[in-house]
Design a protein with these regions (language model features):
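C-terminal beta-strand-rich structural cap/linker in extracellular carbohydrate-active enzymes
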Residues: 433-451
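Short, solvent-exposed turn/loop segments enriched in Gly/Ser/Thr/Pro and often Arg
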Residues: 75-89, 130-139, 200-206, 229-233, ...
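Bacterial N-terminal signal peptides that target proteins for export
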Residues: 1-9
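Active-site-proximal helices and loops of the catalytic beta/alpha 8
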Residues: 118, 184, 200-285, 303, ...
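C-terminal motif of bacterial Sec signal peptides marking the signal peptidase cleavage site
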Residues: 19-21
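Short, surface-exposed beta-strand/loop micro-motifs that present aromatic residues
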Residues: 31-33, 271-274, 310-313, 322, ...
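Carbohydrate-binding surface patches
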Residues: 379-415
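Substrate-binding/active-site clefts of carbohydrate-active enzymes
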Residues: 25-72, 78-192, 212-221, 225
Length: 451
């Protein structure tokens, strides 16, 4: 916050800049997504670590806080019973599912889940479930009760284990009955009232399975939201609303660590905006359950740039920002993935204010909306390489964004006016943009101006 305030004090020196578009995409006429998707913020809830109790009943008490924070979509990590065979740690991986139609007793009962879901809907949230279609636990009833062809099996007839996931058994999507049953699982939860799915390791399943699912589920509810844990234009062709921005996450980490530059970020933006359809949405994040537990917290990976890159995920084109459990209070801790490791306290602090401000910006600034609704990115020329400077504008909504993505102070001397009266999104202060004077940016400083 302090970096932004010092920057705002110098805004009178900012001059207008020549604008250049980052890429060309096909225009879209009809809305591709449910209306509530475009300006939404996703919150990934780790029920086990959300509260000391680690239950739906306790998590329900957290919903008013999240409502005030301004998130819109609650993504629940897997909520189903966890297998015991090959279990990792004491409590096991959420992703080693024993029964898709039941609730993990660690979290409570089906009635507890339904109360949580109803309360979330009363408060205006959408709730999506983690849908793990690639595999079950090795002791799921299907392994012995269903025909052998339901699973991919090795040379001695045992279910195949992928990677170091010895606590799972891979399902066989060449088997039509598996496809049918997994689509029935989706329908079961849609009928319970959930609003969509985050689809685990989506690239492991055939593309046509997702297309079939999309068609059948949206015949029941056309506003269902599908998020792919995968990255590539093919996921949008398959019917997904959004996929992961893994490459962006890597570039941000590398810039913060001095391994890449703003030029690499611009290259990623160019590739995305030319290779993906205009309506494509990418989930943008500085943390999630995988990054936090296996790669480190955003503070470990991004250091002094943690807030800067978090803010960037809110303003890049076609993006949908994600907040992971604990980020809203700046919790700098790697969660134990297979054990109980709850957040010790939820006192609101500067990070709460930071994310609340960004969420409000997201809701009220059409230029920043996702997919085809938001404004295209137009670069400001005449700036040093270390500074990412651009505008986005649509239907009278405009943002001007400047990010010093380096650990050194930077200066900009623009040449062509793009002057006007703006409001600083993070402070609410008014800013007059004038032409012809030098602008100084502190290390990792950023500013988001709206009009």
């Amino acid at each position: 916050m302090k970096r932004n305030l010092s920057f705002v004090a110098l805004l009178g020196a900012l001059c207008g800049l020549i604008l250049s578009s980052c890429g060309t995409q096909t225009e879209v006429v009809a809305d591709r997504h449910a209306e509530w998707v475009y300006n939404s913020v996703v919150y990934e809830m780790n029920v086990r670590q959300q509260t000391a109790e680690g239950t739906f009943a306790a998590a329900e008490e957290r919903l008013p806080f999240l409502k005030e924070l301004g998130v819109d979509i609650i993504w629940l990590m897997p909520i189903h019973p966890i297998g015991e065979k090959g279990r990792k740690g004491t409590l096991g991986s959420y992703y080693a599912i024993k029964n898709y139609r039941e609730i993990n007793p660690e979290f409570g009962t089906m009635a507890d889940f339904e109360r949580f879901l109803n309360k979330a809907h009363e408060l205006g949230f959408k709730v999506i479930l983690d849908y793990v279609a690639n595999h079950t636990s090795p002791d799921a009833a299907w392994v012995t009760e269903k025909p052998a062809e339901w699973y991919v099996r090795d040379s001695v007839g045992e279910p195949v284990v992928q990677y170091d996931w010895w606590d799972i058994a891979k399902l066989n999507y060449a088997c039509e009955d598996v496809r049918k049953e997994m689509k029935e699982v989706q329908k079961f939860w849609i009928e319970k009232g959930v609003d969509g799915f985050r689809c685990d390791v989506a690239g492991e399943m055939p593309d046509d399975f997702w297309t079939e699912s999309w068609n059948e589920i949206r015949a029941i509810n056309p506003d269902v939201y599908f998020l792919a844990e995968g990255e590539g234009p093919n996921f949008h062709a398959d019917g997904f609303d959004a996929c992961y921005a893994w490459k962006l996450k890597d570039v941000m980490n590398n810039i913060a660590q001095g391994k890449q530059t703003t030029g690499d970020l611009k290259q990623w933006i160019e590739e995305f905006t030319t290779e993906y359809p205009r309506e494509a949405i990418q989930l943008m994040f500085t943390s999630n359950h995988d990054e936090n537990s296996w790669s480190g917290t955003e503070f470990e990976r991004l250091g002094a740039a943690a807030k800067t890159f978090a803010a960037l995920t809110y303003v890049l084109p076609q993006g949908q920002p994600l907040i992971y459990t604990g980020q809203e209070v700046g919790y700098d801790h790697r969660f134990e993935f297979f054990e109980k490791d709850p957040i010790p306290g939820w006192e609101a602090n500067e990070y709460t204010d930071f994310y609340r401000t960004l969420n409000e910006l997201r809701h009220t600034t059409p230029a920043l909306w996702a997919g085809e609704k938001g404004g295209e990115l137009v670069y400001l020329t005449g700036v040093v390489e270390e500074v990412l400077a651009f505008t986005r504008e649509v239907e009278g909504s405009k943002v001007l964004c400047l990010f010093n993505l380096s650990a050194e102070p930077q200066s900009v001397i623009p040449t062509v006016a793009a002057a006007g009266e703006y409001t600083c999104a993070m402070t609410g202060e008014k800013a007059t943009i004038e032409a012809g004077k030098e602008l100084h940016l502190e290390p990792w400083a950023y500013v988001i101006l709206t009009k």
